[in-house]
Amino acid sequence: MTTNVQEMFGSLLLDKKIVASLTAMGFEEPSPIQEQTIPLVLEGSDVIGQAQTGTGKTAAFGIPVVQSITDHRHIQALIMTPTRELAIQVAEEIGKIGRTSKIKALPVYGGQPIDRQIRALRSGVQIVIGTPGRLIDHINRKTIKLDHIKFLVLDEADEMLDMGFVDDMEEIMKNLPAERQTLLFSATMPRPILSLTKKYMKAPKNVTISKEELTVPLIDQYYFETKDKIEGLCRLLDAEIDGKLIIFCRTKKGVDDLAIALGSRGYMAEGLHGDLSQTQRDRVMKKFRDGTADILIATDVAARGIDIDNITHVINFDIPQDPESYVHRIG
């Protein structure tokens, strides 16, 4: 398998330690965004990537960042994400990529005691992944120092814009060293994001993954019409589904209402949305991971970054408003 990975990633000029990590993670060949992005980052370019969740974009920036930094104790890469869940998942994946290179990644986000994060930062990490607000908090406390930053990554930049983080994003960007690489990934390119790219990026190279490449051919997709959605859902759960599943609703109230409705019918269902505290969110995810609950009902933003093995079904109880959100959900 190592030989196969080396052959498939060979043209990307990856070192043996990275290849060993990718082999352990089960990689076989680079995805389109990885194949296009990794060489650009390794050659020193800024990159704008238009890609969704499910395309392998975390590894597309994680692999070259890990290869390009050292195991010195200071922070050399900063990655901004819109949600806590995505920060955690990105940190976990980059931690796996960097394991054989002794590169450590730490997620920082609101809702977790900041003292615990400060202790972890002082122990020495090379990559910090976090939500903009908590990153600014650490920067103001000087527990995150920007002097040695070589890479800034903006992951799901349009989502951060939608959540009102654009001022925080710019506050961080304008205080970073001028000599750095900036990598920005976004499903869409609204005007404020384009403005950031023009102001803070140097001759960026563009990587765009077409909508055809975004779809996942191994996923069977079905559409059901029913007069009573809850009754129709329950019949589907009873007749067809045996395993873990995620159900998407458009609103927080929709999540709560459906969780109550399914719970009253005896289903082991838990709801996840942005009004939950971090402790509540962690408890919900623990139940879903360990099988105490086998149905997770979530909003789009709350579900970003969720990485659970053995999910057999995704149900769109409410149809998303755009095709990109649909791909985010099922991918």
Enumerate the language-model features and the residues they cover:
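Conserved helicase RecA-like core
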Residues: T2-I330
